[in-house]
A protein has these predicted regions:
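Structured-RNA-binding interfaces characteristic of tRNA pseudouridine synthases
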Residues: 1-186
Length: 186
């Protein structure tokens, strides 16, 4: 079966997360249903990482094995058509080898957190940023962030139901850029 790599973005507000669950709609479930409607057979869709409930993605990588060969633009367009009106978009599709695995072939992941540092409430960024109405000490934040760089055991930060094999992770970079009242942390 030919394997295809998907690059997708989604608004996770109304999803229980990436992984298919019984307690509500998931991104994985929506993609698998779209693939079923496209090819007429169940297709498992695996991601590089499983986002939690309410988490958005701008470049999530996933893969799926289709029962036959298709043009990559056809796959992208068909999945997007079957995903409507869900807030999920397949941005790119690439044919890859059967050895490629979205999760295990990933060499790094990038996360972005947005802080809006002002007294007025969020409107457009609601659900996409953390509003902090008090002044922030950016120098103290930068100094504290240096302690997170490198290899550390993040057990204390894991959810009880976390299924990752290890809580030991390596943080290569941590950058904080302020533009007006927005602080972007990557």
């Amino acid at each position: 079966m030919p394997r295809y790599k998907l690059t997708i973005e989604y608004d996770g507000t109304n999803f229980v997360g990436w992984q298919q669950q019984d307690n509500g709609p998931s991104v994985q479930g929506a993609l698998q249903t779209a693939a079923l409607n496209f090819v007429g057979a169940h297709v498992a869709c695996m991601a590089a990482g499983r986002t939690d409930s309410g988490v958005h993605a701008l470049g999530q990588v996933a893969h799926l094995d289709l029962p036959s060969h298709y043009d990559t633009d056809t796959i992208r367009d068909a999945l997007n058509a079957h995903l409507r009106p869900a807030p999920i978009a397949v941005l790119d599709v690439e044919r890859v080898s059967e050895q490629f695995h979205a999760r295990f072939s990933a060499t790094r992941r990038t996360y972005r957190y947005v802080i809006v540092n002002r007294r007025t409430p969020l409107t457009v960024k609601r659900g996409r940023a953390w509003l902090v109405p008090r002044p922030l000490d950016e120098n103290a934040m930068l100094e504290a962030s240096k302690h997170l760089l490198g290899k550390h055991d993040f057990t204390s930060f894991r959810a009880a139901e976390c299924q990752a094999k290890s809580a030991v992770k390596t943080l290569d970079t941590l950058e904080s850029v302020r533009t007006g009242d927005h602080i972007n942390i990557t």
